[in-house]
Amino acid sequence: MTFEMLYSKIHRATITDANLNYIGSITIDEDLAKLAKLREGMKVEIVDVNNGERFSTYVILGKKRGEICVNGAAARKVAIGDVVIILAYASMNEDEINAHKPSIVLVDEKNEILEKG
């Protein structure tokens, strides 16, 4: 049996852009994404702290420092400046669960890394 478990999280990131006309995804600063163990194309769930919206999309690695941009139709669910939580889950069996520690990255309002746990 497997369970869906938290794999990684970027906590309280700030939306820097919302691009309705781009093919859907979330663009995340590559250094930040890698620290959070997020991969290009990986499914993530976005929770908007400001408005309560919750939606799924996939990761695109961004080149700009601190960039967090929601693209495509999901851009309607956020506003620039909103605070979001970016979550990734993984299916794990009991042994994997016991050995796993989620990657949790806390950031400030400029998406600069405060803490990695």
From Swiss-Prot:
Its cofactor is pyruvate. GO terms for molecular function: aspartate 1-decarboxylase activity. The active site is at residues 25, 58. Pathway: Cofactor biosynthesis; (R)-pantothenate biosynthesis; beta-alanine from L-aspartate: step 1/1. Its EC number is 4.1.1.11. It is an enzyme of class 4 (lyase). The modification Pyruvic acid (Ser) is found at residue 25. Substrate binds at residues 57, 72-74. Is synthesized initially as an inactive proenzyme, which is activated by self-cleavage at a specific serine bond to produce a beta-subunit with a hydroxyl group at its C-terminus and an alpha-subunit with a pyruvoyl group at its N-terminus. The keyword Secreted does not apply. GO terms for cellular component: cytosol. InterPro entries: Asp_de-COase-like_dom_sf (IPR009010), Asp_decarbox (IPR003190). It is found in: Cytoplasm. Belongs to the PanD family. Catalyzes the pyruvoyl-dependent decarboxylation of aspartate to produce beta-alanine. This is Aspartate 1-decarboxylase.
